[in-house]
Amino acid sequence: MDTRRILEHPVLAPVLSVTFNHDNSCFAVGLDHGFRIYESGSCVLRTSRDFGAGIGMVQMLGRTNILGLVGGGRQTKLSRNKLVLWDDKSKKQVGVISASSLVRGAKMSSKRIVLVLMDRVQVYQTAKPHPLLSTYETTDNPLGLCCLSSDRIAFPGRAIGHVQLVEVETGNVSIITAHTSALRAMALSQDGELLATASEMGTIIRVYATSNCARLYELRRGIDKAIIFSIGFSPSGKYLACTSDKSTLHVFDVTRPGGTRPITSNGGTAYAAGEPSVTGNNRPSSPYSVASSSGGGGGVMVNSNNGGSDMAADDGQGRWGFLSKLPLMPRIFSDPYSFASAKFEMADEPVSNGSREPLTRDGGLAIIGGPLKGNLGWISETEMVVIGAGRDPKWEKFAIQEGGQQDGYQGGGRRLVRVGWKRYGGETP
């Protein structure tokens, strides 16, 4: 009888959350004993701090030494109702912002600090003494959804599926009726000119011009319902990518030549200093070109071994070919699909007895700072990383490549290729 012990992957203390800095060049993870910061492009450990207690979320202020910390884990180091400003160079607390309830998320820039609570968003001045500038009520926001660019803040509205878009300097608020079901993910482009949203349905991603709230695109991830983990724009806003619980990374074209008008021109309503005002054509137009609803992606599907609908890609003529041109056909035949897709790893979580427990559909362990798996960040115009948290944390790097051969495909189209993989978290500081 073979009595040799089966080798099992060691169960590590879980990574509680994953967050990127402003340009995705670094990512930070909260741990049961402290936090770590890595270079996104290489997954090389940059900073490690062991407090002997849990940090639920780490938010970076660019590439500076200032971090925002929120307590978490089995034995928390800090209160979950406070954002502690930590100077990692001097290794000491330099400020604290208290909230009336659990902090669900936080964003930081050189001008503003944004705290996300369950039913409101609070905006503070970054400069000391960090005065509270404004408070915005929201619908319940357990995921802590919020986006911050240099001049705009986006977060859920007071009604399900709505988005509030705030101009940092003026305080003007625009309301975008994005979806009929609750928001699941959102992202601003780096220049703040584009906003992408996804709902709990997970089939459609909508893209808006923030200058006039016009809806520019409706991008179809797939036909089946899915949970969108993360969405993000490439640095120039040319591409948009998303991850979902289908364990698939999709990449879409956003700016296509030949577009002449948006799908709709009345995607939102603006309010100046709390008073209703007319927007629409009075607001400046977006510098981005817009697409019709019948566009093709000019690419190919890769990693197509499963044949599932979630791996479908646009071949330049539309996924459905001539059917997309027929009148009165359902929208699924004419919606733009991703031009390339690839699988990322979303394994079950190992537990202490050696068995494995499946991930929950909402992303698992992480309460703040993002989902357990599928945290997406663009690191260049053609490269992105997908980072998982939990007890088996992984880093994966993908690249858009032109032409070549993969999975039986050979030609001049685009494909999405995994070019790096690493299990992180066990490094010696």
Swiss-Prot record:
SUPFAM superfamilies listed in its UniProt record? WD40 repeat-like
Which domain of life, per UniProt? Eukaryota
Question: According to its record, how does it sit in the membrane?
Answer: Peripheral membrane protein
Principal location listed in the UniProt entry = membrane
Q: Where is this region: Disordered?
A: 262-297
Q: Where are the WD repeats?
A: 10-48, 50-96, 178-218, 223-262
The record's annotation in SMART domains points to:
WD40 (SM00320)
Keyword Membrane carried by entry: yes
Record-linked InterPro entries: PROPPIN, WD40/YVTN_repeat-like_dom_sf, WD40_repeat_dom_sf, WD40_rpt
A single GO CC term, please? Answer: cytoplasmic vesicle membrane
What is a biological process (GO) this protein takes part in? Answer: protein transport
Name the keywords, alphabetized: Cytoplasmic vesicle, Membrane, Protein transport, Repeat, Transport, Vacuole, WD repeat
Can you say where in the cell this protein is located? Vacuole membrane; Cytoplasmic vesicle membrane
Recall the GO molecular function terms of this protein's record: phosphatidylinositol-3,5-bisphosphate binding; phosphatidylinositol-3-phosphate binding; protein-macromolecule adaptor activity
Q: Which Pfam families match?
A: PROPPIN
Quoted from the entry, the domain comment is:
May contain a beta-propeller domain involved in specific binding to phosphatidylinositol 3,5-bisphosphate (PIP2), leading to the association of the protein to the membrane.
What is known about what this protein does? Involved in mitochondrial or peroxisomal functions and amino acid signaling pathways.
Name the family the entry cites: Belongs to the WD repeat PROPPIN family.
- From the Swiss-Prot or TrEMBL record, give the protein name: SVP1-like protein 2
Organism, scientific name: Neurospora crassa (strain ATCC 24698 / 74-OR23-1A / CBS 708.71 / DSM 1257 / FGSC 987)
Which lineage? Answer: Eukaryota, Fungi, Dikarya, Ascomycota, Pezizomycotina
